[in-house]
Amino acid sequence: MPGRPSTSFALLACVCALVVAAPAQAAPSEMEKRLVNRINDARAEHGLRALRMGARLSRGAHAWSRHLVRADSFHHARLRPGTGEILAWGTCSWFRPAQAVRMWLNSPGHRALLLRPGFRAVGTGWTRGAWRGYGCVEMAVARFR
């Protein structure tokens, strides 16, 4: 069967190309993990259960934080009903996950969202970059479901 080996090779080449082209899902950054830990610390201090890190929420939050920095913007995304989102930013010289959570806890609306008992998962995004005339900012996004 003369045509078989080349057909098999072509099929194998296509499958390999698809595997190589598939985007790898990046693991959460150290800052994104620290933000989840600080959120869960705050929830524990108020007698609430820890939230698990949601992969889909994390991918969306990371992409949104990157978008906000690149677009020089600061606004909420359109999310599915039942999903909450909080944003924060600060200059690179001082802004860390603990400061983001402290800011959220000091704002009644953000505090209510962060401490909502019904949420079970959180995803975080953390992006560093030049933004709105600042040479270096850290942009934090937390999404809850």
Spell out what each predicted region is.
Residues 25-30, 44-53, 85-101:
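Second-shell loop/turn segments in exported
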Residues 21-23:
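N-terminal signal peptide c-region/cleavage motif recognized by signal peptidases
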Residues 1-11:
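Bacterial N-terminal signal peptides that target proteins for export
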Residues 10-19:
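Bacterial N-terminal signal peptides
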Residues 58-97, 102, 114-116:
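Short, surface-exposed glycine/acidic/tryptophan-bearing loops
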Residues 45-59, 72-80, 111-127:
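Surface-exposed patches in mature extracellular/periplasmic domains of secreted proteins
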Residues 97-145:
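Disulfide-stabilized extracellular recognition modules
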Residues 27-70:
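A short alpha-helix/helix-coil micro-patch that ends at or immediately precedes a cysteine
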